[in-house]
A protein has these predicted regions:
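Macrodomain-like recognition of ADP-ribose-binding/processing modules
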Residues: 1-140
Length: 141
């Protein structure tokens, strides 16, 4: 898939199979590899362990451990955790815990995603990429 607008061009990979296999192939891929940032939405009630978060916690427990260190009143914050760095090629795997969900889904809270917080978190991810990586480095999100 190729997306183009007037000023930018971006290739979005379509992944078939296990996301974590794709990640391993790219961060260990030598000169053909790249750094990968995995932004994902988290809630603000210190609950990390369902859905995608459960898969992350099983494979990279440090992501969950760091999330639990945040405390309360964190809606709109983004926490970056580097879980791997390829010392030979400099490729990193970084998770971005975007605290953009206010509570959990329930009958009283059917849509807990807070769009203002999500926007704020996405801006933080964008700033992080610009500050951490050189313009010529390959980064996938």
């Amino acid at each position: 898939m190729h997306i183009t607008d007037k000023t930018h061009s971006s290739k979005i990979p379509i992944i078939h199979g296990d996301l974590f296999t794709f990640i391993d192939d790219h961060i260990h891929g030598g000169n053909n590899g790249c750094s990968i940032i995995i932004p994902h939405v988290c809630n603000n009630i210190n609950s990390f362990g369902a859905g995608f978060a459960a898969a992350v916690a099983n494979r990279f427990p440090i992501v969950k451990e760091n999330y639990h260190l945040l405390g309360s009143k964190i809606l709109g914050r983004t926490q970056f955790i580097e879980v791997f760095k390829n010392k030979t090629f400099g490729h990193s795997l970084i998770f971005a815990n975007m605290i953009s969900q206010n509570g959990a889904i329930s009958s009283k809270n059917p849509r807990p995603l807070n769009y203002a917080s999500l926007c704020q978190s996405m801006i933080m991810v964008s700033k992080f990429i610009r500050e951490k990586f050189d313009k010529d480095q390959s980064v996938q999100i």
